[in-house]
Design a protein with these regions (language model features):
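A generic structural signal for short hydrophobic patches within well-formed alpha-helices
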Residues: 21, 47-50, 80, 122
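Short, well-structured N-terminal submotif of metal-dependent ribonuclease cores
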Residues: 1-42, 51-65
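Conserved glycosyltransferase catalytic-site signature
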Residues: 18, 44, 99-101
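Ligand-binding grooves and catalytic loops that recognize ribose/phosphate and carbohydrate rings
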Residues: 59-68, 78, 83
Length: 133
């Protein structure tokens, strides 16, 4: 896995959410085509959610092979702090959950755009741009 820190000069433009990659691994041609046109990364939460969702060993190995080729943003103290701020601001009013807060915080801290089918889960966070593939 290509671990990317905020100090690295090689940056992705987009962070892809779990639901998009789930469709990719399910063989969605439109998603595969879309992902082939953008420079994207994943973060720790997306990686864990995909690993958790792959029940069969073969499926998990396939997913891990693909994920190992992607840019990857690990959790950092800055991301954790931003996620806490987002939870404080949006958890009660908008129902923001921890995984989505960590995804949004990664997007904010690395100045990315979020690619997700779950636009409603993030639309109230004004600091990020959300794109539906």
């Amino acid at each position: 896995m290509d671990f990317v820190s905020g100090a690295d000069t090689v940056m992705a433009k987009y962070l892809v959410d779990t639901n998009v990659l789930s469709k990719f691994f399910a063989g969605d041609v439109d998603v595969k085509t879309f992902l082939g046109t953008i420079d994207f990364a994943i973060n720790t939460i997306v990686y864990i959610e995909l690993a958790q969702g792959s029940i069969k060993k073969q499926q998990r190995e396939l997913i891990e092979r693909h994920l190992s080729t992607l840019k990857y943003y690990p959790l950092t103290p800055a991301i954790s702090k931003k996620a806490i701020e987002l939870i404080d601001k949006y958890s009660a009013a908008e129902g923001l959950f921890l995984p989505d807060a960590l995804v949004a915080a990664t997007v904010i801290e690395h100045d990315l755009e979020l690619v997700t089918f779950n636009v409603k889960d993030f639309k109230f966070i004004k600091e990020i741009k959300v794109i539906k593939p």
